[in-house]
Amino acid sequence: MTQGAQRLVSMRALLESGAHFGHQTKRWNPKMRPYIFTARNGIHIIDLQKTITGLTEAYQFIVETVAAGNKVLFVGTKKQAQETIAEEATRADQLYVIQRWLGGTLTNFVTIRKRLRYLINLEEQRARGEFNKLTKAEALKRDAEIEKLNKIFGGIKTMDRLPGALFIVDPHKEDLAVKEANKVGIPIVAMVDTNCDPDLIDYVIPCNDDAIRSIRLIAAKIADAAIEGRNRRESLQADVAYSQSHDHAMAERMIAEEAEAVE
């Protein structure tokens, strides 16, 4: 377990964020029973000890995933999640989807990648000033196309291969993303409320997936994990580069010494 994971989140922070409030008892998924502490006034109360355990395991997994050179795709298209998901994914230099999930994003990635490259190509043309050669109407049309494509693909524009993991806010709402990830074998970390099916999720973080403060708290921790993983990878790469440089210098000295001995 990483040092960061050992002091990841306090019970107080979870309570203050409202992470313990589930849905109405009549809207529950019975598979969430192990994660529920009790019910009050017709609302299920989530066991926050299970939340801490789930978040800690998810944190460690994300660290290892990013340290291995993979990206994490943050998914949160519900209104109260969009801003936070975009901010935290960007802070951690990861990918995100905050508009409607486009079918085939994972299962038909070859086609999606063509659209991403098309968008990047358009932006490069604009940056080179090539739009200045067009008529005003045509240039405006291209600008509008870039804006439209960025709204759809902006958060995954740099995705040149499938992500190593998905972090999902509300897998019940993001059912298509869940299905695609399961189909292609990409592990899922998710904020799982009492109306969700935890069996579809690899790393369950049982918590309120509707409250803005709860979403902000958990998403920030996942972003922190991605940053820790990236830092670990960069540190390892630096160590390898130093070792290779040191070995090369030593080999050159040995060759030089042998040459002197022969002379």
From Swiss-Prot:
Disulfide bonds: none annotated. Keywords: Ribonucleoprotein, Ribosomal protein. GO terms for molecular function: structural constituent of ribosome. InterPro entries: Ribosomal_uS2, Ribosomal_uS2_bac/mit/plastid, Ribosomal_uS2_CS, Ribosomal_uS2_flav_dom_sf. GO terms for biological process: translation. It comes from the Bacteria. GO terms for cellular component: cytosolic small ribosomal subunit. The keyword Ligase does not apply. It holds the Pfam family Ribosomal_S2. The keyword Ribonucleoprotein applies. Belongs to the universal ribosomal protein uS2 family. This is Small ribosomal subunit protein uS2. The lineage of its organism: Bacteria, Bacillati, Chloroflexota, Chloroflexia, Chloroflexales. The gene is rpsB.
